[in-house]
Design a protein with these regions (language model features):
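Conserved catalytic neighborhood of penicillin-recognizing serine enzymes
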Residues: 91-123, 204-215
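Short, glycine/proline-biased beta-turn/loop segments that scaffold the active-site neighborhood
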Residues: 74-96, 192-200
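Active-site SXXK
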Residues: 42, 55-83, 173
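A short, well-structured edge-of-sheet supersecondary motif
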Residues: 27-47
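Penicillin-recognizing serine hydrolase domain
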Residues: 107, 133-215
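Bacterial N-terminal signal peptides
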Residues: 13-24
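Second-shell loop/turn segments in exported
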Residues: 48-56, 94-101, 109-113, 123-132, ...
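Bacterial N-terminal signal peptides that target proteins for export
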Residues: 2-15
């Protein structure tokens, strides 16, 4: 995860935490894109280049989480479903959990690792487990984007690693963040995890505002 994508992800997750969705990004041409909306109503409080297309990087994982939770809600899998770590998943770089090929994690733990560690290997394991393949999962992501009205988005992979035609906008990610809040209130705890323990290691959330900001 780059510094830029890290900042983007913190902005979106802050919105999920406090009820005001704040999105900020710098695209490849260094044009600022900003969006501040009220989560409960969708009212736009501030916008600057909100419809400007830009590369969403690790914020992509919010759509990965959304698509996974939709599958759970529709009964296609459960939070206890085991997701195997394939050779492709284990090979992902740079931010990863580092599971060996053949290991398996539950959907519940995978979502926690995704939100806290932004783990690219876990994102691929989720994609393969839910969609059968990265391409199949991308189709599900794009179907969800169209259904939500995210007209400026196209997803190619579940982790946001650089790929041609992988694109979104602050407006579209605001729509997605609101959908996560409104459609899955029972899973609100995923957006508030400050750390997870993996063996003897404690991994802190990249969003340093969790547990430090009221809301």
């Amino acid at each position: 995860m780059t510094g830029r994508s890290n900042r983007c992800c913190r902005a979106v997750i802050l919105g999920l935490t406090v009820g005001v969705l704040a999105l900020a990004a710098t695209d490849r041409a260094n044009a600022e894109a900003q969006l501040l909306i009220e989560a409960s109503t969708g009212k736009v409080l501030h916008a600057e280049n909100a419809t400007y297309p830009w590369y969403p990087a690790s914020v992509t994982k919010l759509m990965t989480a959304y698509t996974t939770l939709r599958a759970v809600k529709e009964g296609r899998l459960s939070l206890n479903t085991l997701l195997p770590i394939s050779r492709n998943a284990a090979a992902q770089q740079p931010t990863k959990m580092g599971f060996k090929v053949g290991a398996a994690v539950t959907v519940d733990n995978a979502l926690k690792m995704l939100m806290v560690k932004s783990a690219n290997d876990i994102a691929v394991a989720i994609a393969e487990g839910v969609g059968g393949s990265i391409a199949g999962f991308a189709d599900l992501m794009n179907a969800n984007a169209r259904r939500l009205g995210m007209s400026q988005s196209n997803f190619v992979n579940p982790n946001g690693l650089p790929a041609e035609n992988h694109i979104s906008s602050a407006r579209d990610l605001g729509i997605l963040a609101r959908a996560l809040i409104r459609e899955f209130p029972e899973y609100d705890s995923y957006w508030h995890i400050s750390s997870i323990r993996y063996g003897n290691r404690v991994m802190r959330n990249y969003n340093s505002l969790i547990d430090r900001y009221p809301g």
